[in-house]
Every structure is written in structure tokens, then in C-alpha cells.
Amino acid sequence: MVRKSKKQKNSNKLFLILLPLAVVIATGVLYFSSNKFLSEANCGCGNPDSEQAGRFQENEKIAIFNGNPVRYQMAELTPVKEALKKTVLGQATDERWIEIDLSEQKLYAHNGNKIDYEFLVSSGKWAPTPTGDFRIWIKLKYTKMEGGVKGTGTYYYLPNVPYTQYFYKGYGLHGTYWHNNFGHPMSHGCVNLATPDAEKLFYWTSPAVPEGKRIIRPFQNDPGTRVVIHN
């Protein structure tokens, strides 16, 4: 029988000691990486549903906000002529940009040296609205939003959210049918607007939405409108 040297025995002991530690570290890295990916993918109020993006879902009959059922319009909204007129005649330019003042709970739609619109909003109460300089990366006439935790009073399931414009991951500007408490924080991170205000903004921003379209992304000749959010 071959005897192991003292040096070999010590090496084996060191390996056995370090192996569990390496497994723990690897597991931890995988766990936190997965959580980071999931949190980034699901942050904000929701994410566009690729299969039904922009479409009105007639089969959705129930809406829930903070654990309570709410009523909502169960018919597709028809854009007002004035909103569509702005799409055709008033193509968005680099002079148009959106300012959101979280301390005032107000949105300002700047057009050069003037302000086209000033709206009350509701920003994040149960989760903060991100601050910074962003660009609209997708616009959807309707989308579904779901989040929070069931049984804690934070769960929400909101189908057919109208006039949604995502500006950062799952954070967006959108119409609101589940409350009318604008001017006060009421969201899970998104920027809530009264639906008529959200509609005007939807057709004012870039990329322009042609009549009949329900979803659009920015492209080279028609980039997303700039969105600046500050306290």
C-alpha cells in the first residue's frame, strides 16, 4: 500500500474544507443574479404582453387594486378627433419633452418655450417612481398590469390600462380608471394620469401613433419623447 505524504494529506484536508465554501459562494452568486434579473424584468407597474400588446381584452371582466375589486370601462375607447389631429399635424420634435415634478405631483408637456399641457399626476406611493432623464421606449393603447402581493393589501390586477407609455423598464405614464386622487402619490411606481389627460399625451408624444395603430416603438426618424423626472 502506498502511503500518502504529510503534504498530500494537508492538501486533501484543505480541499475538503474549501469545497463547501465554494458551493455556498456559487449558490449565493446564482441566487442574487437570478433575483436581480427578475427584479429588473418585473420592476414598475408591469411589462408589455407581447402576444396581446396594445389590444383591448374583451374577456377581462375583473380589475383589482390593492386587493379590492374596482369598476372599469369594458368597451374599447375611441380616440377623440382632436387627439388624432395632433398626430397628423403636430409631429413630435426634439423641442417636445415631458417634465414630471414629484414634489408638485404635476406633469408639464413642454413644446419649445411654451407648455402645451399641465396635468396633475399620481406617482409612486407603494414603490418609488424613478427619477432621471429617460425616453419613451414603447407606446400601447392598452396593456395589462399586475403586481404586489396577495393578502397584503398591495395586490393589483389591472387589465386594459389605457394609453400607456413606458419610459424606463416597466415604469410608464398611463391612464387610470381605479382612482381619481390625482395630485397625490397613489401608484406602485408608474405615473398615473386621468384617462382624458393620458390620451392627449399619448397622441402628443413621439413616436407618433397613426390612426388605427395600437402599439408603436421609436425608430430612427421618430425617436421616443424625452421624459425628465425630478423631486
Where are these regions (language model features)?
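Gly/Pro-biased beta-strand-loop elements
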Residues: 70-181, 231
